[in-house]
Amino acid sequence: MSAVVMGYPMPILLNWNREYNRPAWHFAGSHIAKLESLLGAIETLLESKSDDVGEDDVAVLVDAYDMWFQLPPSVLLERYHRLNSEADARIRKQWKDLGISTDSPISPPRQDIIVTTAKDCFPDSYSGSDPHYEHWPKSPMPKDMYGEDTDKVPWSFDPARKYKKVRPRCVNSGLIMGSMGGLRDALKRSKEKIDTVAMKGRQLWSDQALIGEVIGDQEIWREWMRHLGSSWNGSAAFNDRNSLDRTVRDIADVALLGKRFEFGIGLDYNFTTAPPTCSSEEDGYFVNLSNETNIREESQKAGVPGDIRIHGIPSELRNIKDKLLSSTNWGTIPLYTDFFFGTIPIAIHHNAYINGLKGFRLKNWWHKMWYYPHLRHLITRRLQPTSSPPTLAEIDHNGDKIAYKSPQEDKLHKARVFSPKKPNFTPIDWDAVCQKPGHAVKWHDELFGDDKGPLAV
């Protein structure tokens, strides 16, 4: 419902009332199903040959149970393009610093898919999955962003807070977004890994492990590409295999047989999309962006070294075209903010579990969301019939203007359930989505808290 309030397209639900207990999946049933179902939905949409769906359209996958949106889709799309551009610039600089010629037949990779980041690198090789994190890039964030102890992991019984001062550079699969075509190809690679692992009887831990392995293979492949590119003399590259790590040689051998490893996947190092709150339990809170005193007090409470890192309203929030949000004063409403990164995330990912924080925040923080006092009104307005789906954003990107619109099916203003069997996308009533079976409290009473009864649209 937070996505509906903020004007995102009507959600497509994956694995609704599905069974996850395949023996080959071991403990990772719902996680593996998340990726397989997303692949199935994307393939079904792209194969429909509809003029409404294309390979360049952007899809967003989020965890359904612990993610609250607080900013509109135009901001997410603006940041998506910005993060991709920043990643492309870093890679071009890296190649230039290595002396890789611009006439090399190998071009620097470009980013298309973004995955949220984690401070703790899990699962690791001890779990049976091996993302090869030692081959991943270092974080581009400042080396002193947490002070002199940045990136130090103290000995501790606390499994989460010991990573508090680590700059995130590993994968968290709370949010994955990218072009439909790019996601399809990357998810096919993930499915290949699922099938291979299942045949070998190896433990499958999570979708996070699978995405991590795909990214790990990609980073190793990129290492090999840099090795070849740096020796390019205008007509040939010197493939000195003996100087390569064994892991790189293995990827190179398979790549020479035609296997693809580059999928344009990168990470949200900046914590601007929907970063996890695990290992960042006290790093953020709700503040008014125009209230510097409020920001300073909360930054000091969080332990931010030096001066405050939030300075007013982000530019992408200053010109919201959404009519329902256009009069919102973004500086005077409470927005969840990470004080170390100086960012206002698109959404809050409530996976901070230490001392029962997840359950506590899911129950006690909902009323802190800026739209809570207006929730019923906003949702009622969002669900009104329209003649055509709204424009979500118009992005200026490298001199081109890109317009993003909701799908035609959004005229129904209902969530849809994906099924691999036809009908593939079945509308579902909000009562069925929001009411937990056997739960004594009605969903509308819990969600709105206004004693006005059921939602009337």
Task: Name each model-derived stretch.
Residues L45-S127, G174-M177, G181-L187:
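GT-A fold catalytic core of metal-dependent nucleotide-sugar glycosyltransferases
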Residues V4-L13, R82-R90, P109, D217-W224, ...:
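Structural alpha-beta junctions
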Residues P142-F360:
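Catalytic core and acceptor-binding pocket of nucleotide-sugar-dependent glycosyltransferases
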Residues A28, D57, E86, S101-P159, ...:
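Intrinsically disordered, low-complexity, Ser/Thr/Glu/Asp/Lys/Arg-enriched terminal regions and linkers
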Residues P23-H26, S326, A352-G359, W370-H377, ...:
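Extended, compositionally biased interaction tracts of eukaryotic scaffold proteins
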Residues M1-V58, E78-A87, I91-Q94, G181, ...:
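N-terminal anchoring/stem segment of glycosyltransferases
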